Amino acid sequence: MGIKNLKSLLLENKSLTILDDNLYKVYNGIFVDTMSIYIAVANCVRNLEELTTVFIKYVNGWVKKGGHVTLFIDRGSIKIKQDVRDKRRKYSKLTKDRKMLELEKCTSEIQNVTGFMEEEIKAEMQLKIDKLTFQIYLSDSDNIKISLNEILTHFNNNENVTLFYCDERDAEFVMCLEAKTHFSTTGEWPLIISTDQDTMLFASADNHPKMIKNLTQLFKYVPSAEDNYLAKLTALVNGCDFFPGLYGASITPNNLNKIQLFSDFTIDNIVTSLAIKNYYRKTNSTVDVRNIVTFINDYANLDDVYSYIPPCQCTVQEFIFSALDEKWNEFKSSYLESVPLPCQLMYALEPRKEIDVSEVKTLSSYIDFENTKSDIDVIKSISSIFGYSNENCNTIVFGIYKDNLLLSINSSFYFNDSLLITNTKSDNIINIGY
């Protein structure tokens, strides 16, 4: 649930570490994302009676460790989550249909079991049938709500358990907001219990240490500004509850070491992080990049985004080139595109030294509007006359690639309005910098 891969990425980045749950006995309050834990428990049991028993046992165990447990419970409809709900219903129906077929198969097969260890085999198959039957029952969201509400009545008179209903807001969102309030009065976060990886995003909003738990593991999380950036970048690329992500891209532990991380979640930094491979513009579609980045920023910072119109999904190429269009268009306004490359270069370069008369004559000799082919030696000569170098540049201003003049950002990649080339795959590019 939530942001794909975020937990494994934070583990890879060493800010999230796994602890021995048995070594930590007491907490200053425990906050629970109820629905995520309820579903996790439900997937491990065979019937409602067992679910009730196990869930109550978990809560009572948390009371012993935290003194007081607050169960955050989703209630009401969240308007901006309609697309997410529609996708979940579609996925749930497919899962239900698959499990119904599996149930029919098991029900048929159990009738034909005979011979050696018949009773044991039938008993094992019956357990599977019971579990499938219960999972099919829970595939109906109304049944989930009814059964959860029934279980929660067991805590109505329990002074050690508070039921905190989150009207038209996600429970994990409200839970982390309340956890920040808890921190402001006690000086530490409560233990956070959730299986939803959006919780990790919200927990990245400040650099205070946090203890986060799911059903089987306990984590310590000490986020840095870089982790906050990574969490937001992962929400943007891989998607979160309200934004489906950048189609065609994914951040995983396998490619994390190739991605540049920053402290500030700005458009330039984001594009630099994404520039781990070459991209080519496939369509002329543009997207409102600022709106997308603002939404992710506000959501991650626990600002109230529930009145926003969530941004639509776009491809990673659409995001990147829309983000770069402003810089390219600004450059293009003073760029002679229709002349040969040496002339383009002379017009584009800002002199970094005095150019003497003999050098002006040399530059004049390079002006040939009939010659559309570029000579590498001419390019290097022009660069040198203007005070630039082609080797060992600390700051890259332009790159020349197949008669294309490309801009450079952070010396990390080159681009124009139709292609982006990462600096790690730039063997065929002539650098112009200083």
UniProtKB/Swiss-Prot annotation:
Mg(2+) 1 binds at D33, D74, E168, D170. One of its GO terms (biological process) is DNA repair. Disruption phenotype: When G5 is deleted, most of the DNA made in infected cells is not packaged in virus particles. Its main location: virion. The keyword Transmembrane does not apply. Its EC number is 3.1.-.-. Binds 2 magnesium ions per subunit. They probably participate in the reaction catalyzed by the enzyme. CDD domains: PIN_Pox_G5 (cd18674). Mg(2+) 2 binds at D196, D198. One of its GO terms (molecular function) is nuclease activity. Changing D198A: Complete loss of function. GO terms for cellular component: virion component. This is Putative nuclease OPG089. Keywords: DNA damage, DNA repair, Early protein, Hydrolase, Magnesium, Metal-binding, Nuclease, Virion. InterPro entries: Poxvirus_G5 (IPR007678). Belongs to the XPG/RAD2 endonuclease family. FEN1 subfamily. It is found in: Virion. Pfam families: Pox_G5. Its cofactor is Mg(2+). Putative nuclease that seems to be required for double-strand break repair, homologous recombination, and production of full-length viral genomic DNA. Induction: Expressed in the early phase of the viral replicative cycle.
